[in-house]
Structure formats: C-alpha cells, structure tokens
Amino acid sequence: MASRQPEVPALEPSGPLGKMSLPIGMYRRAFSYDDALEDPTPMTPPPSDMGSIPWKPVIPERKYQDLAKVEEGEPSVSPPAPAPPPATDSAEKAPVVKAKATHVIMSSLITKQTQESIQRFEQQAGLRDAGYTPHKGLTTEETKYLRVAEALHKLKLQSGETAREERQPASTQSTPSSSPQASPKQKSRGWFTSGSATALPGPSLSTMDSGSGDKDRSSADKWSLFGPRSLQKSESGGFAIQAYKGAQKPSPMEVMRAQATRRAEEPATFKPPKMDIPVMEGTKQLPRAHSLKPRDLNVLTPTGF
C-alpha cells in the first residue's frame, strides 16, 4: 500500500470533472458502496497491462483553460480542434452564442469519448453479449440508438398482426355460417371463437326440439338457413356454448324426504346395527324411567336442529 502512494495524484487530479476524471477501469482505494452507486464507472478491477493501454479518458486541463477563455469572450482564441465547422458557422454571431455552442460540443465530445472507451473495455473483458445492457453512466440517447431500429421493427410487426386479427373476426362473422369453408381465414383464427360463432343457434334448436314436438318443429325450421342440423351438431362438439346447467344438487329437505321414504319402504335394510357390548344394553333401559320435562329438551336437543 505504501509503495502505491505516489500514484494517487495522477489517478485523482483535482479537476473540474471530479469523479469522471478517473480512468474507466480504475476505482478508488477508499471504496464506499454509496459512492459506487452514483459513480458511472463499472466496478471491475483494472486490467493487468493498465500502463500500456492507449485509451485513458483523462481529459487534460488545457482544454478547459481554452474553454474558460472562450466563455470569457476573447475572440482571438480559436475553438477546439475536433469541432471546427459549427464554431466557424457561429463566428459571425455574438461570442456568447459561440461559447454556448462550444460548451455543448465539448460536453457531447466527453460523453462520446467515455462511451467509446467503455465499449472497448467491455469488448476486452468479454462483457458484450446480446443480453447486456449498459450501466446508468451513459446518457439515454447513447444507450438507445443501437436498439431503436429493432424495437421499432418489433412494434410494427406486432401492430400489423393485431390489426390483421381485428379485421378477421368481422369478415368471418359477416359471412353466413351455412358455408363455413367459404371463408379461408377462419382456419387461422382461434378455434374457440370460430366454433362458438357457427354453433350458437345449437342450444336454441335443442331446447325447441325437446319441447312439445310439432309446434316447435315449425319454428325450428326458421333456423334451417343457418345450415343443416348435422353440421351444427358435429361442430358444436366441445366448443359451443351449450345450455347445460350441470347435475343439480338436491336440497337438504329433498334428501331428508328421500331417506324417510326409503326407511318406510324398507324397514329391514335400515335397521341400525346392534351393539354387542352388554354394558350398553344395560344402560339402554335407563332413559325410559326418566320423566322428561319441557325445560330439559333444551339440553338434550342436538345443536343442528
């Protein structure tokens, strides 16, 4: 630790950038996780050949001295070299506008440079796979611009498919169901909707036929334009909405009545089993000697009644 002490001012220059002035792979030795959450640099150890790597995005102080002179309004100072065309275009205007333009250009250059160095570091470390998303140190424009085209393509595909799906039910329901094979798009739709749409008059036919026959047969013939009855029975197999209410559960009063009638009809089969324990038979005659009064019935009555 003591041998690495003179490297600290080189790694942490007191510049206007603050935390951004660190090299991308380096982290402070006085490490706190609260700072690391706000720090845009990835929490990875530096590569072994840190000195020989040419990309160190430590921006020197002289660029910011030039920028300070331009912001003060000195016309003799030329703008920084990487962006001459916008600076020369705005040279005819007031120096305040030129200073603003150079400030925006410098900030965009800094973010671009850090993004490129981060990408190089990720490629060297093997972090660039398909599921990787960059950390929050990059701005939203720079994280998006690689994936915008794919997302737009997926959105267009999904919207096209949903529009097609919305058009198909209207076309299939407008066609009469006497010829279900006439609309070819019906096969591509879901089986649930197509089956129930063609077989909807099925329950009405079954209820009308199950009634008093000849009166309802004439009214049932009105439904024959929807197709032959055999077709509806075959299509309505498992998918149609049938008027089936399930096995109805008998009420408890009906159950008690049925049990009472059964016991009256077959007294031999419904005899309770006799207990062979002599103690119980001895105690069975005891309740006959008691004379029960009406107030005792409250105690002897079971709770379910």
Swiss-Prot record:
Q: Which GO terms describe its molecular function?
A: oxidoreductase activity
Residue stretches of biased makeup (Pro residues): 77-87
- Gene Ontology cellular component? cytoplasm
Main EC class of this protein?
A: oxidoreductase
Please note every region of biased composition (Low complexity).
169-185
Q: Give residue numbers for the modification (Phosphothreonine).
A: 44, 175
Name one matching Pfam family: P33MONOX
Q: Where in the cell is it found?
A: Cytoplasm
Record's InterPro entries? P33MONOX
Q: Give start-end positions of Basic and acidic residues composition bias.
A: 59-72
Instruction: Locate the motif Flavin-containing monooxygenase motif.
Output: 67-77
Keyword Signal tagged: no
Question: What do we know about how this protein assembles, alone or with others?
Answer: Interacts with NELFB, NOL12 and PRNP.
* Record-stated family: Belongs to the P33MONOX family.
Function, in words = Potential NADPH-dependent oxidoreductase. May be involved in the regulation of neuronal survival, differentiation and axonal outgrowth.
Protein name, per record: Putative monooxygenase p33MONOX
